[in-house]
Amino acid sequence: MTEIDYYELLEISRNSDKSTIKKAYRQMAMKYHPDKNPGDNEAEEKFKAINEAYQVLSDDEKKSIYDRYGKAGLEGHGQRGGGFSGGFDDLGSIFEEMFGFGTSSRSRRERKTYNYNLDVTIEVKLEFNEAVFGCNKEINYKYKTACKPCEGTGAKDGKLSTCPTCKGQGQVHSRQGFMTFAQTCPRCGGTGQATTDSCKSCKGTGYEEVKDNFKVDIPEGVNDGMRIRVSNKGNIAPNGQRGDLYLQVSVKEDSHFVRHDDDIYFEAPIFFTQVALGGTIKVPSLRGELELEIPKGAKDKQQFTFKGEGVKSVQGYGKGDLIIQIKIEYPKALNNEQKELLEKLQDSFGIESKPHETTFEGMFDKVKKWFS
């Protein structure tokens, strides 16, 4: 059975942040919930798989392991297929949106007067060596803080009115047959309150943007696509609560070294005479020079592995390997002297230098018999 990719299952990209993952999960879970698809076994299995995907992708540690090693890497980390342990709160809110259950508790839990997320995600660009060995990086970004005149409401003098669309309930209801469905009010976003006159200071946004900069230690071994959390550097709510800042790592490719997880690959050009004679050559590594023993008769694209010469695992799993792939190169042109020397060398091998003749001779005879 083909393993289902969690990102494909939720129909999101691998660089999606937590809010995108949660939004996709809620949409897919509502679509395939068994109570909306009675008797549909396929929808039920899809619903279980969606929950399994969310349990992994909503957990930073599990997500990092999954991104590197796939589903197999989660074995031994408490992951079980089809479970619900990772999303009871989200499942509860889905029930509320589908059937209108628990409206008052949801309103109490989610009701807020500001209209921005507390967590912030920005991209941090790293050179190849900065990601491999770690570095101290200066971060320049903007965060949001509640507008003081309106206290983050976006309303003039901070005064909000009862939302006319949902009458202060935070939800709107619709009927489909005998079922009644409740959804978050599109106007007030579930707060039950709406702006009549906008605050002049923030023009109704409810926040002000503040520039900030600081230095952060990037750990050794981070990779492209990883996220680093910096606590208490996100947006600030009117009550002083502050979110986190997430650094989305983007690593520039190196012109020679190619990284795959914690392993490093590069191609070493070898002249054909070195392959014929064998010998030792010096090759570059992440931390200096190494000696590579080229055996006589080595093949083009043959790989040689140096254990523990790769990238140090950011999760403490040791170091990856350095894999060198040789590329046999031949002269593009020969002068008269070189041509004469090669012809003499070929003649010195006798019939051994013409393996095609002995191979093809038997094939020619076989083909002739087919038509005789």
Curated annotation (Swiss-Prot):
Report the residue ranges that make up the J domain in this protein.
5-70
Subunit description: Homodimer.
Identify the taxonomic lineage of the organism of origin.
Bacteria, Pseudomonadati, Campylobacterota, Epsilonproteobacteria, Campylobacterales
Q: State the compartments where it is located.
A: Cytoplasm
As to how many cofactors bind and how, the note says: Binds 2 Zn(2+) ions per monomer.
Q: Which GO terms describe its molecular function?
A: ATP binding; heat shock protein binding; unfolded protein binding; zinc ion binding
- On whether Metal-binding is a keyword of this UniProt record, the answer is yes
**CDD domains associated with the record:** DnaJ, DnaJ_C, DnaJ_zf
Species per Swiss-Prot/TrEMBL record? Aliarcobacter butzleri (strain RM4018)
Q: Which PANTHER family match?
A: CHAPERONE PROTEIN DNAJ, DNAJ HOMOLOG 1, MITOCHONDRIAL-RELATED
Positions with a binding annotation for Zn(2+) 1: 147, 150, 199, 202
**Know anything about its domains from the record?**
The J domain is necessary and sufficient to stimulate DnaK ATPase activity. Zinc center 1 plays an important role in the autonomous, DnaK-independent chaperone activity of DnaJ. Zinc center 2 is essential for interaction with DnaK and for DnaJ activity.
Protein name in the entry = Chaperone protein DnaJ
